[in-house]
Amino acid sequence: MKILVAFLVVLTIFGIQSHGYEVFNIISPSNNGGNVQETVTIDNEKNTAIINIHAGSCSSTTIFDYKHGYIASRVLSRRACFILKMDHQNIPPLNNLQWYIYEKQALDNMFSSKYTWVKYNPLESLIKDVDWFLLGSPIEKLCKHIPLYKGEVVENTHNVGAGGCAKAGLLGILGISICADIHV
């Protein structure tokens, strides 16, 4: 009887802890013949999704903070953090991310003609004292003490050109690229 009670207690503890927290590992081939590993953590209680892309010098961490309405992406080989106000028409809700992950795992190559182009500019010197309450603590932990770049969605994409873009894994499926040398 003691074993049954202990088993039920352990099952209850682990069941409660994993209730609002999901972790997915995705390994996919990269363009240079290696592999890209992604770890996607969906926290339904905090209303966030954290995507870690492990790809050598192109490794990055991206936080989708649905509670505060911001996306922050940090390419780990660069000393910069890119912040974008979430556009709910182009960014799927948190509960749909699991479906996108399933599609990514089920389909090796998925092409979408819909892209969201974003232009990033350094935050002005007047905004050095960032209101972290507005952006939320997950983004503060990712981006504090490094230069910040504010993103804005580019509506007119006819004149857009990119010198170099980082678009990998789940971010690529969502149509999000981090680009340098954008001409608008």
Curated annotation (Swiss-Prot):
Assigned GO CC terms: basal part of cell; extracellular space
Cystine links in this protein are 81-143
Question: Mind telling me which Pfam families this protein's record contains?
Answer: BRICHOS
Q: Which GO terms describe its biological process?
A: gene expression; neutrophil activation involved in immune response; NLRP3 inflammasome complex assembly; regulation of cell population proliferation; response to bacterium; response to cortisol; response to wounding
Which subcellular locations apply to this protein? Secreted
Major location category of this protein? secreted
Q: Does the keyword Oxidoreductase apply?
A: no
Please report the stretch or stretches of sequence annotated as the BRICHOS domain.
Answer: 54-151
Q: Which UniProt keywords apply?
A: Disulfide bond, Secreted, Signal
Give the signal peptide as a residue range, or say none if absent. Answer: 1-20
The record's account of tissue expression is: Expressed in gastric mucosa.
| Quaternary organization | Interacts with TFF2. Heterodimer with TFF1; disulfide linked.
Please give the name of this protein.
Gastrokine-2
Q: What is the lineage of its organism?
A: Eukaryota, Metazoa, Chordata, Craniata, Vertebrata
Chain's gene name: GKN2
